[in-house]
């Protein structure tokens, strides 16, 4: 619900920090576009620094999220992460086409992240969004040879990939560092 309130600009990025602190959470996961006109993606360097300062004052970790894996999206998310003092960037690929071609494009995106940002101090997490199965995600992580790359497990996304979530969890478990929790019903 916070995401939807952020889309309506009723909860803004700084508010999310307050909510996390008030609920004794360890940090926030925030998309570069959360808050619309007031999003991190629309903040200048001074505002991003102030957001990071507030998170540190509240002893909160920041995880930046973006909804693509292309260079421009990664560059934007990493720039925001570094300016706010975030610890990680979550991304997910959004490509269509032949699976072999899509996996190749994603592998190239990950290679770009490795070559450009492996020494940035950030960790990177790839999330499956409906298309890739667990073994394909694990292969992408292993083949990347990138120690700072891990997987985000989302129960419902595995259903959308036509894979039983518990089986997917078992396959992905050694590489999972983040989880999205939500209800889902297999019909």
Regions found by a protein language model. Give the residues of each.
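CE4/NodB-like, metal-dependent polysaccharide N-deacetylase domain
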Residues: 79-86, 111-119
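Short, hinge-like loop/turn segments at secondary-structure boundaries
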Residues: 46-48, 81-83, 107-108, 142-145, ...
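Active-site beta-loop-alpha junctions enriched in small/polar residues
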Residues: 1-5, 31-35, 65-69, 94-96, ...
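Conserved beta-strand positions in the central sheet of alpha/beta enzyme cores
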Residues: 28-29, 63-64, 88-90, 177-180
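N-terminal pre-domain/capping segments
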Residues: 1-84
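Acidic/histidine-rich catalytic cores of soluble enzymes
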Residues: 28, 112-187
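Active-site gating/metal-coordination segments in enzymes
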Residues: 75-101, 105
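Active-site-adjacent beta->alpha loops and helix N-cap segments on the catalytic face
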Residues: 39-49, 72-73, 97-109, 133-135
């Amino acid at each position: 619900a916070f995401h939807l309130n952020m889309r309506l600009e009723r909860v803004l990025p700084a508010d999310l920090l307050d909510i996390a602190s008030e609920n004794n959470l360890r940090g926030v996961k925030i998309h570069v576009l959360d808050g619309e006109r007031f999003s991190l993606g629309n903040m200048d360097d001074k505002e991003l620094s102030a957001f990071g300062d507030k998170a540190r004052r509240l002893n909160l970790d920041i995880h930046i999220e973006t909804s693509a894996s292309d260079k421009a999206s990664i560059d934007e998310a990493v720039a925001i992460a570094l300016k706010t003092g975030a610890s990680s960037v979550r991304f997910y690929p959004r490509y269509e086409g032949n699976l072999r071609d899509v996996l190749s494009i994603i592998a190239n995106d990950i290679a770009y992240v490795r070559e450009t940002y492996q020494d940035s101090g950030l960790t990177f997490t790839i999330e499956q969004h409906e298309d890739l199965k667990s073994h394909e995600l694990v292969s992408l992580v292993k083949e990347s040879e990138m120690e700072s790359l891990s997987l985000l497990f989302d129960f419902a996304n595995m259903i959308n990939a036509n894979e039983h979530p518990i089986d997917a969890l078992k396959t992905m478990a050694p590489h999972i560092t983040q989880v999205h929790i939500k209800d889902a019903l297999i019909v």
